[in-house]
């Protein structure tokens, strides 16, 4: 009886802590949702979730055009115009690069791998100026296809994802490569017929990370996009902050909520594979 009582107490305490941490983590999102239905005075009156005088003005104002050239639907379309190519290029290039480093021995392999890892320690702010000058030479600034934001991802420049896939690939037995070679598969056939299907969860986790990071990216569009009609959601929310008339925080929070809805939907649809990819990639280092 003593052991059962202590186990029940431990279980209760464990779930109590988990529920408490969960509430603390989700409360800001719940508060943001409730604040979209409040006016400024009620928003700053406290941090409670209760809505005394609900209003839809925040959502009505969020759907208005700003400067006559862009609205929230156009901003969302602009966002996914570069997010989707960036995700695809990142996953494909990182997978190919990881396959090369993880499965082949070639001269200078360790040196190139160490150089690649060293780029992880370079802060993005150091690269902003040379990248800006280079893309200006190419004529990619303010491109209608947002080339300056995503084209570099086609060359496996997202080192974090290359490293993550290499760690996951170490869990794939090399016997499968040898069996595929015996069956007459080339290296690329082995990659997309054998390796890629087994990397499914890891590829999903890479795609989700890049999708969320790209949707939330503010500095990239700020540097390379200058036409208001091409602004993505990150710049559109900033554009909605009109300092002359005062901040309508319900409108700003409504825009913020709408901007993250797609990310939440995508994450919850793929969360099982996402968790599996993250955990499986950490089995071997």
Question: Which residues does each predicted region cover?
Answer:
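A structural signal for multi-pass alpha-helical bundles of membrane permease subunits
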Residues: 3-285
């Amino acid at each position: 009886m003593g052991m059962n009582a202590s186990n029940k107490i431990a279980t209760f305490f464990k779930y109590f802590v988990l529920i408490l941490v969960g509430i603390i983590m989700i409360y800001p999102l719940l508060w943001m949702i409730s604040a979209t239905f409040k006016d400024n005075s009620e928003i700053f009156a406290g941090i409670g979730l209760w809505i005394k005088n609900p209003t839809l003005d925040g959502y009505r104002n969020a759907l208005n055009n700003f400067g006559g050239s862009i609205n929230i639907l156009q901003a969302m379309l602009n966002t996914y115009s570069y997010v989707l190519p960036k995700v695809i290029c990142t996953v494909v290039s990182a997978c190919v690069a990881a396959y090369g480093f993880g499965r082949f021995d070639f001269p200078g392999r360790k040196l190139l791998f160490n150089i690649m890892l060293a780029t992880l320690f370079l802060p993005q702010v150091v690269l902003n100026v040379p990248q800006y000058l280079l893309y200006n030479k190419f004529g990619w600034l303010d491109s209608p296809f947002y080339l300056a934001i995503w084209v570099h991802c086609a060359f496996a420049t997202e080192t974090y994802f290359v490293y993550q896939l290499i760690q996951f690939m170490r869990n794939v037995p090399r016997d499968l490569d040898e069996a595929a070679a015996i069956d007459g598969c080339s290296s690329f056939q082995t990659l997309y017929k054998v390796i890629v299907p087994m990397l499914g969860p890891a590829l999903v986790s890479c795609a989700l990370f890049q999708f969320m990071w790209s949707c939330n990216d503010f500095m990239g569009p700020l540097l390379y996009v200058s036409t208001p009609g091409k602004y993505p959601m990150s710049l559109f929310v900033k554009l909605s902050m009109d300092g002359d008339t005062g901040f309508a925080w319900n409108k700003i929070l409504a825009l913020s909520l709408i901007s993250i809805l797609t990310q939440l939907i995508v994450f919850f649809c793929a969360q099982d594979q996402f968790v599996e990819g993250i955990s499986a990639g950490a089995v071997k280092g």
